[in-house]
């Protein structure tokens, strides 16, 4: 039997089955069922308080909605394509439960402000979980950084050995990236904390509703100030997706380095078996698949952002059916970033750090060349001249297989007689790292200060 459309009074014919399926959104917007019921309960409570609905009718609707909430939690609700979307499906189920009085729930409300409210609630509910998941990863970074303050490794520019650094310093760089992610998502909460309900289709309503009461019931900071903006605004979704894309880009950069460092050529890290897989043909393989998946999933999250930007860019005010396309990318982004954060945290927490291999990589790579140039500058040689001198020494060393610390003192004293035995002390990788104690530098004291500051942030 055909379903009677709640909007069908103006129509003489129904669309083809395939058109109905094309227009339906229940396959994905059912993920907002809890938010839709939450919004409806607040709306009908407001209608009761303002006496727009008789108390008896409102109480009957409230009882029915609460029963649907229980059934939803128990997984007992069944949705149909014939009822198009989550709003119509739940209203149909409410009608089955309490009869025609269910139709009064939609008084002073449109699906336009209803879906916008659902979407706000969906993002509002998930933002704290996203922020906490980022902080959980930050805690792992801080813990591992604290254990590796004096672990020496090559620092890179252009993927070439540049200067020796502390592995703890490296990890704290990602902590700072993630802290900016936290701050962006926290700012996202401000724009999400506005309530569209009461804007109706686009122009408000003639009923004497109390939007401030509804906002309070739903724990929103305030209602939207403009009804057109309320039903058409998806900036908060764009912000979430932009933040998610930046977050995933940070995770992807980290995973790229994890992948490289687990290779035989680097050998700095070894992931635990829990976060690795093997090969169906090559028995020796231990592949960093989880890191590769996070790197790969970054593309899809970036795509969701670009997709919604493209959808919205040409929409006239106020609501358009195009906005049905605002949800799937959002839902998928949430389902992508949460396990990605957990996987990266787990990989780092359980990875073996090959400290010896890291340190050895700094011994014959000439990454102490800047130390020698700085040393010469302290002897009164202009830095540019010192730079050129060290460059020549590096070139000579590359040809002869001699490191800077293997050059005889007599050779150094040909450059400047003031050069003493202490030059060899300064050329040690650990000393080079330890001495870089400028604010924010890789010096051990600075890294410890970064870690303490991070712990303070995480304790708030």
Curated annotation (Swiss-Prot):
It catalyses: 2-(N(omega)-L-arginino)succinate = fumarate + L-arginine. Coiled coil: none annotated. It is found in: Cytoplasm. It holds the Pfam family Lyase_1. Keywords: Amino-acid biosynthesis, Arginine biosynthesis, Cytoplasm, Lyase. One of its GO terms (cellular component) is cytosol. Its EC number is 4.3.2.1. Disulfide bonds: none annotated. This is Argininosuccinate lyase. Pathway: Amino-acid biosynthesis; L-arginine biosynthesis; L-arginine from L-ornithine and carbamoyl phosphate: step 3/3. One of its GO terms (biological process) is arginine biosynthetic process via ornithine. GO terms for molecular function: argininosuccinate lyase activity. It comes from Limosilactobacillus fermentum (strain NBRC 3956 / LMG 18251). Belongs to the lyase 1 family. Argininosuccinate lyase subfamily. NCBIfam families: argH (TIGR00838).
